[in-house]
């Protein structure tokens, strides 16, 4: 079943007052992640609870307690093949979790001696990463309060790390309830199984590999230095490597590398920049590696061919002028020749009429 069935045992429904809530996943070859947020709003009713699920970088489900009819909803077409039982079951689980978060917010406020008037928030993240062979790489479960770490499941999935003395109270309760074992069983089992299922259902989208469109741009800083920026655009999945090299040697220590960003169309973009001496640009290359490429790309800044362009324009103009002049000369010669023939014909005609009176004169 789905992730949150782990919360079903009532012994685990008590976190601080003993409720067990959920947490994150880091990206591996493929990942399944759930993010929960609960926000108290004194004087405005029940806390708001929002849950979203991601496969890799694609949001595929969402629940919002403030919706007119709160239900888990699909966010991608390939999730619509799930039957009514799936959505009904998960909607019930989310509604239960919203109530757990409501209790947790009150309990944590007491742990930190906070007043009832302020707004507070809980964030939980959990999930699993699998490798290309479909086996578990890592599992995650983290819990935060008011933007700070609170408690997390350790990497071996057998013990907890508490961030402060208040979290130590929760840690002792969860250790007594065997919460770590329950979560380890889920992360190593059901989480991986559901991720495989989602990858199969959405394989046309999730398992595609769109290669990057890459190029290098040139930006002058001063007379002595320039910035070379290597761009990779329109690629999927998110994982990509951009490395500047100087005559084959990596320059990773000196280059500026931004985080991969969504392009807004389901693909990603990224760039890496390096400051180099002016005039030495051709000694530097950018190496691009991505799943969608059959082999890595090696790019170099290509200076615009301005001198050749200007020379071509000049030559073209000269040829045009020469052609115009030649045409004018030929035209003038042609005109002169035509006038000479007209004069000759006219003179011959006058002479013939004078000597031969028998020629018929045309009527006027």
From Swiss-Prot:
Region (Alpha-2): 118-209
UniProt xrefs under SUPFAM superfamilies: Immunoglobulin (SSF48726), MHC antigen-recognition domain (SSF54452)
Alpha-1, as annotated region: 28-117
Renumbered residue ranges of the record's region Connecting peptide: 302-310
Glycosylation sites: 113
One CC-aspect GO term: extracellular space
GO terms under biological process: antigen processing and presentation of endogenous peptide antigen via MHC class I via ER pathway, TAP-independent; antigen processing and presentation of endogenous peptide antigen via MHC class Ib; immune response; positive regulation of T cell mediated cytotoxicity
Disulphide linkage map: 128-191, 230-286
Topology in membrane: Single-pass type I membrane protein
Subcellular locations according to the entry: Membrane
Source species, domain of life: Eukaryota
Region (Alpha-3): 210-301
Segments forming domain Ig-like C1-type: 212-298
PANTHER family found in the cross-reference section: HLA CLASS I HISTOCOMPATIBILITY ANTIGEN, C ALPHA CHAIN, MHC CLASS I-RELATED
Its job: Involved in the presentation of foreign antigens to the immune system.
UniProt subunit comment: Heterodimer of an alpha chain and a beta chain (beta-2-microglobulin).
UniProt-recorded name of the protein: BOLA class I histocompatibility antigen, alpha chain BL3-7
């Amino acid at each position: 079943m789905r992730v949150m069935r782990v919360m079903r045992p009532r012994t685990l429904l008590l976190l601080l007052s003993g409720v067990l809530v959920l947490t994150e996943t880091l990206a591996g070859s493929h990942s399944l992640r759930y993010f929960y947020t609960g926000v108290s709003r004194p004087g405005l009713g029940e806390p708001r609870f929002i849950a979203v699920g991601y496969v890799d970088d694609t949001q595929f489900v969402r629940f919002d307690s403030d919706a007119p009819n709160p239900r888990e909803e699909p966010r991608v077409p390939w999730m619509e093949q799930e039957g009514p039982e799936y959505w009904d079951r998960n909607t019930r689980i989310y509604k239960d979790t919203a109530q757990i978060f409501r209790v947790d917010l009150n309990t944590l406020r007491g742990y930190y001696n906070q007043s009832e008037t302020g707004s507070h928030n809980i964030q939980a993240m959990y999930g699993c990463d699998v490798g290309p062979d479909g086996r578990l790489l890592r599992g995650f479960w983290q819990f935060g309060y008011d933007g700070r770490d609170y408690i997390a499941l350790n990497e071996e999935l057998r013990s907890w790390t508490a961030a402060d003395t208040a979290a130590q109270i929760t840690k002792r309760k969860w250790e007594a309830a065997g919460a770590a074992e329950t979560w380890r069983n889920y992360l190593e089992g059901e989480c991986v199984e559901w991720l495989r299922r989602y990858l199969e259902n959405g394989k046309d989208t999730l398992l595609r590999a769109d290669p990057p469109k890459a190029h290098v741009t040139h930006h002058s800083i001063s007379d002595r230095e320039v910035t070379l920026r290597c761009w990779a655009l329109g690629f999927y999945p998110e994982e990509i490597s951009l490395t500047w090299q100087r005559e084959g040697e990596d320059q990773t220590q000196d280059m500026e590398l931004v985080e991969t960003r969504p392009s807004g169309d389901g693909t990603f973009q990224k760039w890496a920049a390096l400051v180099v001496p002016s005039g030495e640009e051709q000694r530097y290359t950018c190496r691009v590696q991505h799943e969608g490429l059959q082999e890595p790309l090696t790019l170099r800044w290509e200076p615009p061919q301005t001198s050749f362009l200007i020379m071509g324009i000049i030559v073209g103009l000269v040829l045009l002028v020469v052609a115009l002049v030649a045409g004018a000369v030929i035209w003038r010669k042609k005109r002169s020749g035509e006038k000479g023939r007209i004069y000759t014909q006219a003179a011959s005609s006058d002479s013939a009429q004078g000597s031969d009176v028998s020629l018929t004169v045309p009527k006027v």
